[in-house]
Amino acid sequence: MDGDNQSENSQFLLLGISESPEQQQILFWMFLSMYLVTVLGNVLIILAISSDSHLHTPMYFFLANLSFTDLFFVTNTIPKMLVNFQSQNKAISYAGCLTQLYFLVSLVTLDNLILAVMAYDRYVAICCPLHYVTAMSPGLCVLLLSLCWGLSVLYGLLLTLLLTRVTFCGPREIHYLFCDMYILLRLACSNTHIIHTVLVATGCFIFLTPLGFMTTSYVCIVRTILQIPSASKKYKAFSTCASHLGVVSLFYGTLAMVYLQPLHTYSMKDSVATVMYAVVTPMMNPFIYSLRNKDMHGALGRVLRRLFQRPK
């Protein structure tokens, strides 16, 4: 089957992680609840930061963008899952699958790059506090975010275009929650060696480079904090980094569970890792960042009071 016929006629069946009607009902309500919590948490973070002038700083600017990315990410995948749980027709078109894959790759990459920029922000704030205002100027923050978006869009486009060169034949049944690059390559009947090599090489660069940068930044941060004589100032400095470290650990940990395995052993039933990476991480990020943050507590409290305040 050539590429033109494939794009016009083929479709995939997103069978999910269970074909039992009873389990699908349980999964529907579970994912719906998690989706609503994720949307509410990230929207509140964005509203709190945008409405409080005290939070108009580089750290919270990038946090608001991280929340927006997580919001977009779950909206790209979960609504289709919910429809499939309730429908007998679980088909997704070839174009729809590629579109979902494009946004999936782009948004995961964007999350990764924003986390790296946030690590740089913490490095400058703790290791070079006297230069923080100039080093993290509004113009530079916008430039860094624009670079993150640009690289993410290009990387998503690259992988999606590579997948259009793949020929699919036989049953196009995806025992998975959404269209994923590794899953689709498992369904290919053409030679995917070159595409897999490009995928691994570019993935290592896109994800391991920021991880290495974050690791180096935190080594410098820890060394600087250990030199602070005051115990209270040490605690304050550590607490400003703890939330970011928690999110980074959750992000890379779940990503590694899903993707750090050879293509031929990639499991279509690896449901726990998939749910962690696709749903739990975006849901937990707002809680991790607001858990011990007094400024965020205050801003969220003011937003909630305005939302529920009765008009006089």
From Swiss-Prot:
Residues 1-25, 80-100, 159-196, 261-271 are extracellular. It is found in: Cell membrane. Residues 50-57, 121-140, 221-237, 292-312 are cytoplasmic. Glycans are attached at residue 5. The keyword Lipid biosynthesis does not apply. GO terms for cellular component: plasma membrane. GO terms for molecular function: G protein-coupled receptor activity; olfactory receptor activity. Pfam families: 7tm_4. InterPro entries: GPCR_Rhodpsn, GPCR_Rhodpsn_7TM, Olfact_rcpt. It is a multi-pass membrane protein. Keywords: Cell membrane, Disulfide bond, G-protein coupled receptor, Glycoprotein, Membrane, Olfaction, Receptor, Sensory transduction, Transducer, Transmembrane, Transmembrane helix. The keyword Disulfide bond applies. The chain crosses the membrane at residues 26-49, 58-79, 101-120, 141-158, 197-220, 238-260, 272-291. Disulfide bonds join 97-189. Belongs to the G-protein coupled receptor 1 family. Odorant receptor. This is Olfactory receptor 1D5. It comes from Pan paniscus. The lineage of its organism: Eukaryota, Metazoa, Chordata, Craniata, Vertebrata.
